[in-house]
Amino acid sequence: RARGKYIAYCEGDDYWTDPLKLQKQVDFMEENPEYSMCFHKVDILSPDVKDIGLYDHLCEREYSAYEIYDRWTIPTCSVLYNRHKLKPLRPKTCIFGDIVLFLSLANGGKLFCLDFVGGVYRRHSGGVSTQNNNKLHKALYHQYKEMEKIFPDVREISNKRKINYLGLLLYDNSSRDTWKFRFQYMWLNKRLFISKFLIITIID
């Protein structure tokens, strides 16, 4: 287990490109103790040109938990966080552990993006984020279902993603649970429709 005050990530075949990356991030964190985590921009290496601008929207400012979850804002290889501000919350089913980590850190402090490019995020067809199969969809459905309870402040996003993955499981004839997923999908969509209708009615 790491014992230092700060922890930085560089997973798999991602890599850092700025030799002063860690110094810049530690300096920021030391000067701004109210922040639990900081991150920065990255270049993307991918065979798919659609991926190249994935993080172009990032700019130097504070980000909320809702923002980073809604748009999946943070490149994992850019992260440095204060270990003492981490309040670990983890669902039993966890495919994408990075977003769980970031939301947990958002509970312990603020999040900030620094204005420099400090690494390369490599995206390829074999990665978990690019896979498309029913086993993965089922696992993600359960992860978001649990995250609804663990992170109530961003429950709306978890619910939408849960319904999205549930919809992808409706036609999986190889699973005994398909009928359950179909029933849950109908019920969740009904609740979502009623909620939106009530909100619109109240506003009008």
Pin down the residues of each PLM region:
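The conserved acidic donor/metal-binding loop of glycosyltransferases
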Residues: 11-15, 41
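Membrane-interface aromatic/basic loop that binds lipid-linked glycans or pyrophosphate carriers
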Residues: 149, 169-204
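Amphipathic alpha-helical repeat scaffolds of TPR domains
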Residues: 158-172
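Catalytic core of nucleotide-sugar-dependent glycosyltransferases
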Residues: 66-67, 103, 121-125, 130-155, ...
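Conserved donor NDP-sugar-binding/catalytic core segment of glycosyltransferases
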Residues: 20-52
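Glycine-rich, basic loop-to-helix element that forms the pyrophosphate-binding segment
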Residues: 1-2, 24
